[in-house]
Every structure is written in C-alpha cells, then in structure tokens.
A protein has these predicted regions:
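HhH-family (HhH-GPD) DNA N-glycosylase catalytic core used in base-excision repair
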Residues: 1-173
C-alpha cells in the first residue's frame, strides 16, 4: 500500500494504477490471466532509482527507491508497524523518505487497520473547514479534532465524509 500512497501527492489515480501495473509486470510474479502480483519491498530494494524513473515516477522515484532500501531487508517491517500504537506507528512511518503525515495516515488506515487514522486531503479539509470552522487549523490539529469528534473509528467517518463530498451529498455551509 505504501508504494501507491508515496505517489499520491504527485499523480492522479489513473497514473498511479498505470505505474503500479508497470511495476508489477516488470518485477512481480505472474498470477495468470495477464495479472501480476506486487513484487514486494525486498525485490524493489534491488531496483535502481533510474529504473523507477523510467516508469514515470518522477521525483517520487527517489522516495520509492529509498524506502525500499530501508524496509526491503526486513520482511516484518509492516507487520511490526501494525502492532504499534497509532502514534508510534505514524512516527515510525514518517521517518521513511517521502512519507509525511497524510501518507502515513493513509497507509495506517488502509494497510494496518488503524481506524483512528484520519487522512486529510483537499476534499476532507474542505468538509472540516466548511462544517466545523477549522480553516485556521493545521493538518495535525484537524486530525486531532477528528479523532476526538468521531472517536476511535474516525477513519470510517473519514471515508463517509470523503465519499459524501465527492458525490455532492454534503452541502457546504
């Protein structure tokens, strides 16, 4: 999951899917029916940064390469992350190259079952700003507000807010 989220700040979803498919085809295992598995960080740790760049990763190629160097030798890295508290897991992920608070929250919510993670993108920020008056709040302050307001499962609330905003179901004030 983290591989895809590292790209998220610079690419559209179709571009991310395309790059993911290219990476899987180039370094992953064939699964049949023209499908390929994700190669894993261990395999990606052997890929040169230039080879990532050739797949249209742009400046994110360095981050993917550097993360692969850090986690590629530890097959338990992400399972160990999921065993940590939310705060400790987030702190650990943010230490990785190219991983900031939003990417860490996405990886924790969708990849480590940390339901208290509340990723804030422009859609979520718009909802929080217009409905809760949080325009002057930082990312961390908005995320803390969400955890207190929506509780331990605020990550689920985030999904409803995101979908509602994207579908035009949430009326702006």
């Amino acid at each position: 999951m983290l591989f895809y989220y590292i790209q998220r700040t610079a690419k559209s979803i179709p571009q991310i899917k395309e790059i993911g498919s290219l990476v899987c085809q180039k370094w992953g295992q064939p699964l049949g029916n023209n499908l390929w598995g994700f190669p894993g960080w261990s395999k990606l740790s052997k890929v040169r940064e230039e080879d990532f760049r050739k797949l249209k990763l742009g400046y994110r190629a360095k981050y993917v390469h550097d993360v692969a160097q850090v986690v590629g030798d530890d097959p338990f890295y992400f399972s160990n992350i999921s065993q940590l508290s939310y705060d400790d897991a987030k702190s650990e992920l943010i230490r990785l190259p190219g991983v900031g608070p939003k990417i860490a929250d996405c990886a924790l919510l969708f990849g480590a079952n940390k339901t208290e993670a509340f990723p804030i993108d422009t859609w979520i920020a718009k909802v929080l700003d217009s409905h809760y008056g949080l325009e002057s709040f930082t990312y961390s302050q908005k995320a803390l507000f969400a955890r207190k307001h929506f509780g331990l499962f605020c990550g689920f609330a985030q999904q409803f807010l995101f979908s509602g905003e994207r579908l035009g179901l949430i009326k702006s004030k």
